[in-house]
Amino acid sequence: MALVEREHMKEDAGRLSEATAGDFIALLKPRVMSLVVFTAFVGMVLAPANPHPFLALISILAIAVGAGASGALNMWYDADIDAVMARTAGRPVPAGRIAPGEALGFGLFLSAFSVGTLGLMANWLAASLLAFTIFFYVVIYTMWLKRSTAQNIVIGGAAGALPPVVGWAAMTGSVSLESLVLFLIIFLWTPPHFWALALFKEGDYERAGVPMMPNVAGAASTRRQIFAYSVLVAVSGVLPTAMGFASLSYGAVAAALGVAFVWYSWRVLAAKGQDPALRPEKALFGYSVLYLFAIFAALLCDGLVERFGA
C-alpha cells in the first residue's frame, strides 16, 4: 500500500494552533523519554567518574530535552502516517491540536538547546553524541529507514541505544567498551520489542504503508527472528558480569531475566499466531518493556553498591 500523501499536512504547516501545555508535553513522547533518561542515568552512574551533582543534574536534563526534541520532530514528520493508524491518530499533530510548523519549530529549538547546554556544561563529545542521536533518529530512521525497509527497527534502533553512551561520555569525556555493552543490550532488545508490537498491530502499519517485518517477510518469519534476537538479548544481558564491570549478583538477575525473555519469545514462536487474540505476542511486548527497565535497574543497583558500598 502506498504511503499516505503529505499534502494535506503541508497546507496547515504555517497555521497557529490553540494547543495546551499538555499537548506540547505529549509531543515530547514522555514514556519514551522516561526510558531514555533512565538508561542515560545508569550510564552516568556506572561511569568511572565523580562529577559534581549539579553537573550530573544538568547533563541528565539536557539528555531528556534532547530525547523530547527527537519525539517532537518525529511526530512532525510522521503526522501523515500517524493520522491513519489507530494507535497514533490521537497524537497532537494528526489530531490537529498542534500545527505542523509549531511542532517543527519546537523540536528544532529543543534540539539546539539540549546539545548546546550539554556541550557547555559537560563536554562537546557528549554533546556531539546527543546531536548524532537526534539526527539519526529523525533523519536516518524517521525520514528514511522507517518508510523504506523492513530493517527500519534494526538499524534505527541505534538511536534508542545511544543514551547510556551519551550519559557515560557526559561524565568521563570518553566512550568505553563498557558503555558500548550498554548500547548493545538496548540495540539487540529493540527488534523483538517492536516486532512483537507489529505482530498485533499489523493492520495499522499496513494501512499506513510502513514496511514492518510482519508486512514484508510474513508473520512466521518475524516470529523466528524475534526468537533469535531474544537469545542474543539474553546473552548480552550477562556481558557486564562476563566483562568484569558488574557483580555475580547482577549476572544472576540478568540471566533469570534473559531466560524469561527467551521463554516469552518461544511462546510466540510456538503459538504460530493461532491465538486469535495474539496473547503471546502481547505478553512478550509487555515483558520486553519490563525487561529493559529491570536489567538497567539491576545495573544501577549494582553500580550504586560498588560506588557507595553495601
Curated annotation (Swiss-Prot):
Matches recorded under CDD domains: PT_UbiA_Cox10
Keyword Membrane belongs to the record: yes
Entries under InterPro entries matching the protein: Protohaem_IX_farnesylTrfase, UbiA_prenyltransferase, UbiA_prenylTrfase_CS, UbiA_sf
Keywords annotated in UniProt: Cell inner membrane, Cell membrane, Heme biosynthesis, Membrane, Transferase, Transmembrane, Transmembrane helix
One GO process term, biological-process aspect: heme O biosynthetic process
Enzyme Commission numbers on file: 2.5.1.141
Cellular component, GO, one term: plasma membrane
Bilayer-crossing regions: 32-52, 53-73, 104-124, 125-145, 153-173, 180-200, 226-246, 251-271, 285-305
Molecular function as annotated in GO: protoheme IX farnesyltransferase activity
Record's catalysed reaction(s): heme b + (2E,6E)-farnesyl diphosphate + H2O = Fe(II)-heme o + diphosphate
Compartmental location: Cell inner membrane
Protein topology in the membrane: Multi-pass membrane protein
Pathway connected to this protein: Porphyrin-containing compound metabolism; heme O biosynthesis; heme O from protoheme: step 1/1
Class of this enzyme: transferase
Summary of the function given for this chain in its UniProt record: Converts heme B (protoheme IX) to heme O by substitution of the vinyl group on carbon 2 of heme B porphyrin ring with a hydroxyethyl farnesyl side group.
Matching HAMAP family: CyoE_CtaB
Family statement drawn from the similarity comment of this UniProt entry: Belongs to the UbiA prenyltransferase family. Protoheme IX farnesyltransferase subfamily.
Additional comment: Carbon 2 of the heme B porphyrin ring is defined according to the Fischer nomenclature.
Protein name listed in UniProt: Protoheme IX farnesyltransferase
Organism for this UniProt entry: Chelativorans sp. (strain BNC1)
